[in-house]
Amino acid sequence: MKKVRKSFVLLLTGLLAVLILSACGQKTQQDIVAGLDEKAKEYTSYKAKAKMTIETGSEPQVYNVEIWHKKPSLYRVYLENPKKDQNQVILRNENGVFVLTPSLNKSFRFQSDWPNNSSQVYLFESLVKDVQNDSDAVFTAKEKKYVFETKTNYQHNKMLPTQEITFNKKDMSPSSVKVMDTDRKVMVKVEFSSFEFNKQFDKESFDEKKNMTLSQMDVATSAKPSDTFAVKTPLELPLGVKLLEEKDISTEDGKRIIMTYGGEKSFTLIQEKAQIAKASSSVTLNGEPVNLGYTIGALSDASLSWTYDGVDYLLSSKDLSKEEMVTVAKSMQGQSSK
């Protein structure tokens, strides 16, 4: 009888131990968020590579992205569109925030809080922040991944309210990000191919002049923009706004198209062939870099400028909000009959 009782006690103890160990192995959502927070605090730097696909316009835009970050505030994001033979670099260093366009030997310098002012799909600390800030985030644990569905924090784009962020269980690094519109259609997808924490950088890694020179080696800077270009018109306009006038002006470098829109609100849209600067030039703006889906633009209170496919664009308005300017620019995929 004593042997039976002893065996029963041992069996019960073993079962309890298994249950306790099993319970300990099942981490809660709060545990994972705490783990992400700890990871965000402990790393000193990282390097990552990813493919970013943006479903805007008539066809998807695919970018190769390389991300460098060194705490507390050094950033380098290299964006390459192989199909268009076009690249841009977003830098943040002690001199400010820069958007470099190496193929044109041009750069914009911003007085900006980028990247802290909105969600950034390719920055680890921004993704962790979005998870932490959403008390209603939906969490799913998979075999090798942790998946969060959270709200986004885009200042000038309310049409992309939701994102799905997937982290690797092994080291908490991001695996993928899917940003969805109000119909839950994936509009932006980032797939990380590599992510390494605590990497070493030299002193020139985040220098604007050094990055301009290195990036120029990756594009055919000797290839001049075409003398002609297809004039584009926005596919999305604010309610009650229409095209009032279109002027074609001859310049030393070709033509300049000036479109005037009016109605409930008004704005002017200028398009002209982009010129390669003879010497590296930098323009300082009181604004911020903004992702238009197919290129990085320079956004201020009353204007939005960008370069794409060898053409310079300038949208200026005292009536449109920043969000409206971004919406108009993002829809510049239509072709006029010119």
Swiss-Prot record:
Location relative to the cell: Cell membrane
Keywords assigned: Cell membrane, Membrane, Sporulation, Transmembrane, Transmembrane helix
Induction section of the entry: Expression is controlled by a sigma-E-regulated promoter which needs the sigma-E factor for the binding of the RNA polymerase and subsequent transcription.
GO CC field: plasma membrane
Principal place of residence: membrane
Protein topology in the membrane: Single-pass membrane protein
One annotated GO biological process: sporulation resulting in formation of a cellular spore
Top-level taxon: Bacteria
Keyword Phosphoprotein: no
Membrane-crossing segments per the record: 8-25
InterPro entries, per the entry: LolA/LolB/LppX, Sporulation_related
Database matches in PANTHER family: SPORULATION PROTEIN YDCC (PTHR37507:SF2)
Function: required for efficient sporulation.
Protein name, as recorded: Sporulation protein YdcC
UniProt gene name: ydcC
